[in-house]
From Swiss-Prot:
Organism classification: Eukaryota, Metazoa, Chordata, Craniata, Vertebrata
Activity regulation text: The apolipoprotein APOC2 acts as a coactivator of LPL activity. Ca(2+) binding promotes protein stability and formation of the active homodimer. Interaction with GPIHBP1 protects LPL against inactivation by ANGPTL4.
Keywords: Calcium, Cell membrane, Chylomicron, Disulfide bond, Extracellular matrix, Glycoprotein, Heparin-binding, Hydrolase, Lipid degradation, Lipid metabolism, Membrane, Metal-binding, Nitration, Secreted, Signal, VLDL
Entry PTM: Tyrosine nitration after lipopolysaccharide (LPS) challenge down-regulates the lipase activity.
Entry-linked CDD domains: Pancreat_lipase_like, PLAT_LPL
The protein's name: Lipoprotein lipase
Source organism (scientific name): Cavia porcellus (Guinea pig)
């Protein structure tokens, strides 16, 4: 019987690859199953090719598996966030397996070298997952990879090389340098798992130079606070921490925004009753104007663990505001105001304060700035509160003067007439219209804040998408 030589060679090559894959001695990455009782230390390693190691580490074959992949390290040691994330995962999923992928030796080289090593680390992780699937028939539908910085791209490489697609990859501020313009096969991409979600928290700088990658690389890409920088991470906060804790925490300050991605995910695990919401938007500028607080047709989503796994044809860029510390959730509002009057001057960069009063609490003197204000125009802007004030009942609006001895006090104060203020609450999707408590409210710069209450016409106030 004649056998086509090309077919035979192809079959032999395939068999050779299969046999090589069964030799796992060249895998350098380590896979430690940490426990709820010991989230800090790697006490038990699952070793590819050594079947008894899985039983020895008490691996739960019927539960979810989280694989945590760290990023670049200067010290060659795990960072302090690792046990925090492990503990939070176990608190949310007590019967799960949390495996920390140790690639510390490769991660402590100069950054470009460690960036190149992500391909080998990803290959190691993929071979481990394939072995678990082949040897134990473990369902890859139960596997969730969580990669931080360079670890996010290692997770992407792993996902692209598994025999069956893993359920989910979460990219925690995937690294930017060496990856912003890289091919999809060398970095995290939507093709690497059944669902890929990404948190971008430190994208400040030009593309390719920012610590975190700027472009969307998942099915859903979330940019908290615009993604460039995070509240609580500025120089004033740095000086405060140094005064309290000394210079020993300086490295944490440098990583503050980058690492915020991890803590936002931890927050979603610990505060499951109140998930933060992100909103789909074409740009952060449009989001800052409050134009994107819609939840219709999957336009809003939960942040972190309980995200709705929506796979669109192209990546969804989503935005939200957060607090500077955990819990990070805030409450978003779009405010629209029509400024009427006879003023002929256009005022630029004007500072205002708005106060919100609700059935549960109030949030007073929330500052905002309008780039320009002129008569007979409508302006939309975004504000947020750090507390849930309940259903809105009343507003106050104040136009702030630059100083007591400003030019306006000499030449007469600029004045606008405000009849109605329209507010949309992002979290509840309610639209409310507020009318002046007086017949007409005069908004004067530096003067007392006029009061607005819910309009009596019920048709003006409704729930909307």
């Amino acid at each position: 019987m004649n056998i086509d030589r090309k077919i035979l060679n192809k079959a032999l090559a395939k068999e050779k690859v299969a046999n090589c894959q069964k030799d796992y001695t060249d895998i350098e990455s380590k896979f430690a199953r940490r426990t709820p009782e010991n989230t800090v230390e790697d006490t038990c390693h699952l070793i590819p090719g050594v079947t008894e190691s899985v039983a020895n580490c008490h691996f739960n074959h019927s539960s979810k598996t989280f694989m945590v992949i760290h990023g670049w390290t200067v010290t060659g040691m795990y960072e302090s966030w690792v046990p925090k994330l492990v503990a939070a995962l176990y608190k949310r999923e007590p019967d799960s397996n949390v495996i920390v992928v140790d690639w510390l030796r490769r991660a402590q080289h100069h950054y470009p070298e460690s960036a190149d090593y992500t391909k080998l680390v990803g290959e190691d992780v993929a071979r481990f997952i394939n072995w678990m699937e082949d040897e134990f028939k473990y369902s890859v539908d139960n596997v969730h990879l969580l990669g931080y910085s360079l670890g996010a791209h290692a997770a992407g490489v792993a996902g692209s090389r598994t025999n069956t697609k893993v359920s989910r990859i979460t990219g925690l501020d995937p690294a930017g340098p060496n990856f912003e313009y890289a091919e999809a096969t060398s970095r995290l991409s939507p093709d690497d798992a059944q669902f890929v979600d990404v948190l971008h928290t430190f994208t400040r700088g030009s593309p390719g130079r920012s610590i975190g990658i700027q472009k969307p690389v998942g099915h859903v890409d979330i940019y908290p606070n615009g993604g460039s920088f995070q509240p609580g991470c500025n120089i004033q906060d740095a000086l405060r921490v140094i005064s309290q804790k000394g210079f020993g925490d300086m490295d944490q300050l440098v990583k503050c925004s980058h690492e915020r991605s991890i803590h936002l995910f931890i927050d979603s695990l610990l505060n499951e009753e109140n998930p933060s919401k992100a909103y789909r938007c074409n740009s952060k500028e449009a989001f800052e104007k409050g134009l994107c607080l819609s939840c219709r047709k999957n336009r809003c989503n939960n942040v972190g663990y309980e995200i709705n796994k929506v796979r669109a044809k192209r990546s969804s860029k989503m935005y939200l505001k957060t607090r500077s510390q955990m819990p990070y959730k805030v409450f978003h509002y779009q405010v629209k105001i029509y400024f009427s009057g006879t003023e002929t001057t256009t005022y630029t960069n004007q500072a205002f304060e708005i106060s919100l009063y609700g059935t549960v609490a109030e949030s007073e003197n929330i500052p905002f700035t309008l780039p320009e204000v002129s008569a007979n125009n409508t302006y939309s802007f975004l504000i947020y509160t750090e507390v849930d004030i309940g259903e809105l009942l009343m507003l106050k609006l104040k136009w702030i003067t630059e100083s007591y001895f400003s030019w306006s006090s000499w030449w007469g104060r600029p004045t606008f007439t405000i009849e109605k203020i329209r507010v949309k609450a992002g979290e509840t999707q309610k639209k409310i219209v507020f009318c002046s408590r007086e017949k007409v409210s005069k908004l004067q710069k530096g003067k007392e804040a006029p009061v607005f209450v819910k309009c009596h016409d019920k048709s003006l106030n409704k729930k909307s998408g």
